[in-house]
Amino acid sequence: MAAGTPVWSSRFAFIMASVGFAVGLGNIWRFPYVTGENGGGAFVLVYLLFVFAIGVPCVMAELMVGRRGQSSPSKSMAAVAQESGLSRLWGGVGGLGVFTAYTISITYAVVVGWVLWYLVQALMTGFAGYDAAMATSTFEGLLADGSTMLIMTILGNLIVGGIIFAGVTGGIERAVTFMMPLLFALLIGLGIYNMFAGGFGETLSWLFTPDFSKIDGPVLLAAVGQAFFSIGVGMGGMMAYGSYLPANFSITRGAMMIVLADTLVALLAGLVVFPMVFNYGLDMAGGAGLIFQTLPVAFAQMPGGHIFAVLFFVMLSVAGVTSMVGLLEAVTSWTDQKTTLGRELSAVVVVGSVTFCSIASVFSYNVWQDYTLFGMNFNAASEGLYDKITLPLGGLLIALFVGWFMKRDFAFSELATDEQTFGIWQLLLKFVVVPAIAIILITGLI
């Protein structure tokens, strides 16, 4: 390892940190809905095919560059490029990932703040007496209350900042080795509860009964997009975490475990969320509306709903915080190595600046909602920037670099696998991953 580079103390800590980064709120509120709307079990089969054909090679590529470079994403890319006889300007690709992580953090921090606010409400009331109108008015009231949103955003960022400030082993490892097993335990426990609470059979049918008649071009594109966006690549986080890997760690096995765990969380989330929707005849919805408007109505009606609500929002809080840690670790690593601030002060500056920029995101829901650029407010413009441009562009350039330009011997030595496995990985990266991400980028722009 390079002098001064932190090292994960165990494989378990690394896997938990990487899974925590990959598993975000989108796994819980988007994947089940997208699955049901796109053919159920047939979509799951197609998604699993793409997540292993696209997700695993992408994760392997980022981890490999990170470990080879043993530095921040931009410096790792530049170092590996130079080692391969290429221009250090390739480091800009790593810098693009850091920029994407920073941009996502600004709006994501506000959503984590919502989750924390709803956790407080769950603890206080359990959403007793909520109906659809009350749930909607509560969420709309929160969006209109800029002060409360800002306070909760600051609270979430203080938690994330404290973890990053404490360092890789003293902060991130300690947090994720507690929080991620807790997340899995809560998912499994809440899923088991739903097995006996009604609506479970309908959920299994909705999510897993194949309807191959629904598999068409848009559904395939949805599966490709879900496979790419759900695994945390193109944001520098995997590369930063990879830079802390010891030489004897198997990147191939690690990537498989990360993608498997990420997919398992998404599937388990469907078994937690949708039995409540079916059992209480609630409106099917995707995104934030599902979590903050639909489910509180279910919590109000179900036996033990108060406890269920608390555990559910604890689970969401864990998913949100661990994702934010991965995003801001990439930015902190970059800041630490680009400046003379040092690790701790870099963490303070990064988290502080994200919190300041989040003011624009908070106020875009209320007092600044009418201030637009090209017809979009701050949040819409930010999300359009990273969803449609910087995230897929960064993923595409990394895949191009590793698949087509990085010296084969370097990649082979880092992966330390047999020729057949290496050949399959390289084939997928060159001829499946690159075209797939290019399609995501192009369709997002047209």
Features from the language model and the residues they span:
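Transmembrane helix-boundary motif of multi-pass solute transporters/channels
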Residues: 13-50, 236-242, 252-256, 260-263, ...
